[in-house]
A protein has these predicted regions:
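Generic hydrophobic, amphipathic alpha-helix propensity
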Residues: 20-29, 45, 71-83, 148
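Helix-turn-helix
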Residues: 23, 31-66, 70
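Amphipathic alpha-helical packing segments from all-alpha helical-bundle domains
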Residues: 77-85, 112, 121, 131-158, ...
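Short hydrophobic clusters on alpha-helical segments that form packing/core surfaces
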Residues: 24, 28-32, 106, 203
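Hydrophobic alpha-helical connector segments
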Residues: 70, 84-116, 169-173, 196
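N-terminal intrinsically disordered/low-complexity leader segments
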Residues: 1-19
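C-terminal peripheral helix-coil segments that are non-catalytic and often amphipathic
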Residues: 1-7, 101, 108, 142-157, ...
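Short helix-capping/turn signature of helix-turn-helix
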Residues: 61, 122-129
Length: 209
């Protein structure tokens, strides 16, 4: 995955430092996606990034926790920006419309950023890693259901949705998207657009007044 160098330069780094840092983050994302979180080592990241030494990783991130924080922040920003851009044409006050856009866009994200989705799954499964970033579980949970649950709660208060449990519906949507991700990983020929539409239809009926 190509990481935006500009976001690294904002940390006050030189162009060379920002480029190397972005290169390491991108290589870590690719390594986790290919080998899984547990088998991702500095040695594998070094090889993937084409670095001369693992010491370059330690120089930029100090330890595994710092690297994983940067990786998760990058993936989170990528997904949040993707969802935001793909939902720009929907009226913010149209709660059902925003719910549909969220579901369809979340499914489309699987196709456009498969490595990011794999990283989220892997990091969620290893959130208790002692050497990892302590806030991993909280951040992944927020990305998976936090914003969606707030959207559902607001829609229920406004009368846009029926008498639903926002927490249960948000979790159900997240798990449904996980199911699509698993199906897509097993068979890349699946029609993700159709999956997105049908899931959106399903939850539109489930949340209707």
């Amino acid at each position: 995955m190509q990481v935006n160098i500009d976001t690294q330069a904002e940390l006050g780094l030189s162009v060379t430092e920002a480029t190397t840092r972005a290169q390491i983050i991108g290589a870590t994302i690719a390594t986790i996606a290919d080998h899984g979180y547990a088998r991702t080592t500095f040695a594998r990241i070094k090889e993937r990034a084409g670095l001369s030494s693992t010491r370059l990783i330690s120089y930029h991130f100090t330890n595994k926790a710092g690297l994983m924080q940067a990786v998760l922040s990058t993936v989170s920003e990528t997904k949040s920006e993707y969802l935001r851009e793909r939902s720009e044409g929907v009226d913010p006050a149209d709660r059902p419309g925003n719910l549909r856009a969220y579901i369809e866009t979340s499914v489309a994200f699987l196709r456009d950023y498969p490595q990011c989705e794999r990283v989220l799954v892997e990091m969620a499964a290893h959130a208790d890693d002692r050497d990892g970033w302590a806030m991993t579980g909280v951040m992944v949970g927020q990305l998976r259901t936090g914003a969606l649950q707030r959207q559902l709660e607001q829609g229920r208060k406004e009368g846009a949705f029926g008498d639903i449990s926002p927490e249960i519906v948000a979790l159900s949507i997240a798990q449904a998207v996980d199911g699509v991700a698993a199906a897509y990983a097993a068979d890349p020929s699946v029609d993700l657009d159709r999956y997105g539409r049908e899931l959106a239809d399903l939850f539109a009926r489930a949340t209707a007044r």
